[in-house]
Amino acid sequence: MSDITNEKKPLNSDPEILLRKRRNADRTRLEKQELARQRQEQRKKEQIKNKKKFIRAESLVANSLATSREKERIKRISKLEHKKLKGDVSHLPSEKNFFLKVTEKPQSEETDDLIDEDEEDGFEREKVAYNGEEQLLFVLRVKGPVAASIPHKAYRILSTLRLEEVNTAVFIKLTETTFSLLKIIAPYVIVGKPSLKSIRSLIQKRSKIVYKREDEEEAKEIILNDNNIVEEKLGDCGVICIDDIIHEIATLGENFTKCNFFLQPFKLNREVSGFSSLNKLKKLEQREVEKKTRKVSNASTAPIVQIDIDALIAKIN
């Protein structure tokens, strides 16, 4: 008679903590689906409401004229760049592209003597030729010309740079090709050369990535504050921590593109927000400053305005 061994077999069940996680995940998924359905219904209601909204004839005319001017500006730039590629630049005073650096004039330098017309508004302007070397630029998306719809070509460039939303920003590597793209989207962005301090501040405070954890079904946006995630995603490139990402971006290293697209576009604050009397006054002052620093030209050879981006980052970061 063979010996019968009564071995204790483990129950075919999952631990309580795993069941709780699954239950929470199911509840979260259902809540997200319900929110998505509500947003879709709200969007449909707004579309129906906008269709019935009365629009004045003056608004239609203003929108049409502003959009036509913007399309004509882009057409001129595209035509000029095409001629440059063909070498037909005999009609141009210079083949180079230019920056117009606009900086606030230090108060200590203000005197009662006669000053140039460019400096009467408190800003110094310097036109600098672009030498074709690779440079790091910080590009911030802002509102474009009043009443103008964004032309398709400009919107495609903004989408490629991941700048569909206002007050989002990215780092880009400036080359001859990207300079031409910046000329097309110039009215919709603010451009500047960031310092290492600003780069470090942005990445440490505002950096987010899309990451999928083991216990999650879908990838979601999280704050980047774990070097283990950096090593997991970028370790093959020799980038193992956040400081390595800062170094690659600041020095335009060989892994600049991978590190840059690993980060989501930076979502920054508004320079002035709120509806109090003081904030309304600040908004008026901000508009006056923008009129002086962001003068948009419809000329195809207009330089790209470059501002003191470090001062702006300190305000909105």
From Swiss-Prot:
CDD domains: Ribosomal_L7_archeal_euk (cd01657)
Gene3D superfamilies linked to this entry: Ribosomal protein L30, ferredoxin-like fold domain
Cited InterPro entries: Ribo_uL30_ferredoxin-like_sf, Ribosomal_uL30, Ribosomal_uL30_CS, Ribosomal_uL30_euk_arc, Ribosomal_uL30_ferredoxin-like
Disordered: region residues: 1-50
Keywords: Nucleus, Ribosome biogenesis, RNA-binding
Name the record gives this protein: Ribosome biogenesis protein RLP7
Family: Belongs to the universal ribosomal protein uL30 family.
Entry's localization field: Nucleus, Nucleolus
Organism of derivation: Candida glabrata (strain ATCC 2001 / BCRC 20586 / JCM 3761 / NBRC 0622 / NRRL Y-65 / CBS 138) (Yeast)
GO BP field: exonucleolytic trimming to generate mature 5'-end of 5.8S rRNA from tricistronic rRNA transcript (SSU-rRNA, 5.8S rRNA, LSU-rRNA); maturation of LSU-rRNA from tricistronic rRNA transcript (SSU-rRNA, 5.8S rRNA, LSU-rRNA)
Coiled-coil boundaries: none
Residue pairs linked by disulfide bridges in the UniProt entry: none
General function of this protein: Involved in the biogenesis of the 60S ribosomal subunit. May act as a specificity factor that binds precursor rRNAs and tethers the enzymes that carry out the early 5' to 3' exonucleolytic reactions that generate the mature rRNAs.
SUPFAM superfamilies for this protein: Ribosomal protein L30p/L7e
Biased composition range(s): Basic and acidic residues: 1-11, 25-49
GO molecular function terms noted in the UniProt entry: rRNA primary transcript binding; structural constituent of ribosome
Pfam families given in the database record: Ribosomal_L30 (PF00327)
Cellular component annotations (GO), alphabetically ordered: cytosolic large ribosomal subunit; nucleolus; preribosome, large subunit precursor
